[in-house]
Structures are given as structure tokens and as C-alpha cells.
């Protein structure tokens, strides 16, 4: 079975794809070809540079997202908004982000030239011809890779030898056609571009909607062309249930790489657990998402010791504002020197009396083990609502460990609270205020 991995774009949020790759690697899936467009170029660059999925996750954790932005010469900004070449350039990506992520264009070319190597292709648009080129990994270089992520308005294009190279997103954001041209019998599409019915107001959201329409439209055109040619293949798609936070939230620290990675792992495991050998129908439903119910997202971190060494638990919890609007979502990881970082699969939140529990599975010591982290909440809502939330019991593989939320963890939790699925200022503020006032008692009240 010849498999192609098709990595769609998604900006800096493609940190999510590192979590997906961790799950696929654990399953032993191998690919003979990797294709990438836009932000997916980062994931392909890491894979084709020889990084394991574990290394990819570690490197994303250490990236400073501010390095994605680098300023133009000061004189360019004096031209005024109507003559500004772009908000910034790709120097930060080339000089800081690529090295931090372990992306080495020389290594990519060298590895691609080896006998039996995984094939690679990077989609970049040449503007003078308005044409998308799937540049082979044997011919790619760092400047072209960065150009493939240089969105108009935000980053300047690459000008080279009379040609202008830029992000392919306005033509396509995933190249299934290239995968089929290279003989794929099975295509794994890793998709983190929003695709819900929600239409937002304002220039940023509508700029993103244009990307969504271009990306989804080109994908459907690939499906239709394959069907017209009688080209059969199996399609698997890993995508979030709800659209991921946008890049500005990542850049401003309202979501971080570790959270996106854990979400990617959660979403990949959800698909792997439910997939069939026949894959998915090749239509608009394969990448469709739903809007989350109004609520909040927060980061819950606790620490303890096992065998005299530090144990860290970290969860990202998405909690709807009203019971019946949906179930809470849970993703995250457990970290210990003996086994490293293991991610949560099938995460859920359960309430039993005054006990609030996070439950999930983790792949540990070659097998799946059930994990439960439980708080018993006695205090009434009010100023002391957080005091009894600082202690929890972790159960894993028959072992029980006491974990504690330090003052720094509690402060970080409160600082991490972000509204989700809420689009007006009043609705967003209300969701955050209610949770921060009542703490984890709010979960008991609702669920």
C-alpha cells in the first residue's frame, strides 16, 4: 500500500500537527511521500529533516512564537499603509524558527537523494504565472520553503531571478492531486484549517474565511478531478472537531504550543479509534467542523513525585457555559523522567457527587493504561472556591499519587482562562467571569 501524507496549512497552529504525527508514529504508519502547503511546510520540513515525532513535539515546545514575526527596514513603514510591502518579512522564520524546529534544507535534499528515500513535495506559488509548483524535496531550499508560508499582506514574497514566490493558499492549501500523481493508493490528509458554517465579522475573520474557501474549494476540485479520471484511492482525514484558535491567539500567548500539540494527539487518536479500512467519503464532509458551544478554555497543571522524581500533569479543558450545550473536552499530557511525555487520549470530564475527575488513556510501557485525576470539592462558591481545588489524586496503572497545584499553577490557570465559541464582548466576558469567580465548583454546578 503506497501512502501519501498530505499536510494542509494552518499558520503557526500547525504545532497541532506534531501531536498528530506522534499518534501516527505510535501506530507504526509509514508514508512513501509527504506533501505540504503553507504552514504544513513546517511539519514536512521537520519530518524530511529526519526528526521523530517525539523530537517534533519537544522542539515546538521550545519555540518562541514571536520569532515568526520580523520587521521590515524602518523606511518601508514610512511609505504609509497603501504602499507598505507587507507587515513583516520571513527573516525570523529563516533565521530563528527553522533552526529551532530542526529544519535543515541541506539535510532534506541529501536525504531525498538517498535510495528508497521518502519522497517530498513543497507547494509554492509563482506569482508571475499564477501557478502552484509542487517543488521536489531534492530541489527545495530554505528560502522557497519560507516563501511557501509568506501570506500576502503579512509577509513579503521571495523575489528571485525575475520570479515572485509566495504562499500557495490562494490556489490550494493541500495537494491531493500531487499525491495521486506520485502513485498514492491511500492518502492521509492532516487538516487544521477551520471549516465550520460560522461567518464572522471584521477583517481578520473574513481574511481567514477567504483562506477557508480557497482551501476547501481546491480540495473538492482535486476529488472531482480524480473521480472524473476514474482514479480510486482511500482517503483518511484527521481534523479537529471544532476550529482551532487563530494565529493571533497563539502569538499573544492565549494558547500555547503544548496545548495545540495535545489537541492534535487527541484528535488523531479519536480518528484512529473510529476509522475503517475504506476511509471517508471524498466530499465536503471530510473536513467539516462544528462551532464549539459558548464556554471557556483553561490550563490545569499539577505536580507531585513518583520514585523520588518529579511528575507533572497538564490538561487543557474546554468547558461549555451551559449544561446540555455539549460535553467538556480534555487534552493534555503526563510528564516523568522515566517515560518522558505521554499524551492523553479519549479524555473526558466526569462528576460524581463532590468528586470532579479527569479520565483518559495513556500509552505507557507498551500498552494502554487508564488514568484518572480526581479532586474532591467541599468548599462553597465564593472567595475560597479555589482552595480545595489545589489537591488531587492521580490513579495510573494501580498506583496512586497525590498531586498539588502550586500558587504559580493556580495563577497560571486563572491567566489561561479564554472564552471559546463566544463572539461578542459581553458574552466572552460573562463566560470568563463566572468561571473565575466560582472555580471548579462551576464544573460541579453544570455537570
Which sequence ranges carry the predicted segments?
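Beta-strand-enriched cores of mature, soluble protein domains
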Residues: 289-447
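Patatin-like phospholipase
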Residues: 1-37, 45-293, 423
Amino acid at each position: 500500500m503506497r501512502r501519501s501524507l498530505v499536510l494542509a496549512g494552518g499558520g503557526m497552529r500547525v504545532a497541532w500537527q506534531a501531536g498528530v504525527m506522534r499518534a501516527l508514529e505510535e501506530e507504526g504508519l509509514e508514508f512513501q511521500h509527504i506533501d505540504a502547503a503553507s504552514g504544513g511546510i513546517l511539519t514536512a520540513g521537520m519530518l524530511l529533516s529526519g526528526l521523530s515525532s517525539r523530537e517534533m513535539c519537544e522542539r515546538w515546545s521550545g519555540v518562541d512564537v514571536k520569532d515568526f514575526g520580523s520587521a521590515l527596514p524602518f523606511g518601508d513603514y514610512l511609505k504609509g499603509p497603501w504602499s507598505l510591502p507587507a507587515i513583516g518579512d520571513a527573516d525570523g522564520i529563516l533565521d530563528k524558527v527553522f533552526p529551532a524546529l530542526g529544519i535543515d534544507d541541506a539535510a532534506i535534499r541529501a536525504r531525498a537523494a538517498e535510495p528508497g528515500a521518502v519522497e517530498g513535495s513543497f507547494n509554492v506559488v509563482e506569482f508571475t504565472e499564477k501557478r502552484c509548483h509542487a517543488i521536489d524535496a531534492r530541489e527545495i531550499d530554505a528560502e522557497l520553503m519560507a516563501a511557501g508560508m509568506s501570506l500576502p499582506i503579512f509577509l513579503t514574497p521571495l523575489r528571485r531571478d525575475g520570479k515572485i514566490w509566495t504562499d500557495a493558499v490562494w490556489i490550494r492549501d493541500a495537494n491531493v492531486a500531487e499525491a495521486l500523481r506520485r502513485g498514492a493508493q491511500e492518502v492521509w490528509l492532516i487538516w487544521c484549517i477551520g471549516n465550520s458554517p460560522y461567518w464572522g465579522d471584521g477583517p481578520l475573520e473574513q481574511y481567514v474565511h477567504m483562506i477557508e474557501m480557497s482551501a476547501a474549494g481546491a480540495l473538492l476540485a482535486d476529488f472531482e478531478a480524480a473521480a472524473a479520471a476514474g482514479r480510486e484511492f482511500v482517503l483518511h482525514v484527521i481534523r479537529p472537531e471544532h476550529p482551532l484558535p487563530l494565529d493571533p491567539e497563539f502569538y499573544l500567548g492565549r494558547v500555547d504550543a503544548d496545548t495545540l500539540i495535545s489537541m492534535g494527539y487527541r484528535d488523531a487518536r479519536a480518528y484512529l479509534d473510529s476509522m475503517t479500512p475504506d476511509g471517508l467519503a471524498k466530499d465536503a464532509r471530510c473536513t467539516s467542523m462544528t462551532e464549539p458551544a459558548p464556554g471557556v478554555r483553561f490550563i490545569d497543571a499539577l505536580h507531585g513525585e513518583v520514585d523520588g522524581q518529579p511528575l507533572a500533569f497538564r490538561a487543557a479543558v474546554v468547558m461549555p457555559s451551559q449544561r446540555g450545550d455539549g460535553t467538556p473536552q480534555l487534552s493534555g499530557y503526563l510528564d516523568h523522567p522515566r517515560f518522558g511525555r505521554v499524551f492523553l487520549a479519549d479524555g473526558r470530564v466526569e462528576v460524581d457527587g463532590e468528586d470532579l475527575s479527569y479520565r483518559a488513556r495513556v500509552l505507557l510501557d507498551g500498552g494502554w493504561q487508564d488514568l484518572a485525576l480526581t479532586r474532591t470539592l467541599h468548599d462553597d462558591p465564593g472567595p475560597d472556591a479555589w482552595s480545595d481545588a489545589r489537591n488531587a489524586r492521580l490513579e495510573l496503572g494501580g498506583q496512586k499519587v497525590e498531586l498539588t497545584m502550586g500558587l504559580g499553577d493556580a495563577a497560571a490557570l486563572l491567566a489561561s482562562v479564554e472564552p471559546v465559541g463566544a463572539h461578542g464582548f459581553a458574552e466572552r466576558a460573562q463566560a470568563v467571569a463566572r468561571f473565575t469567580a466560582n472555580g471548579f465548583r462551576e464544573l460541579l454546578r453544570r455537570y
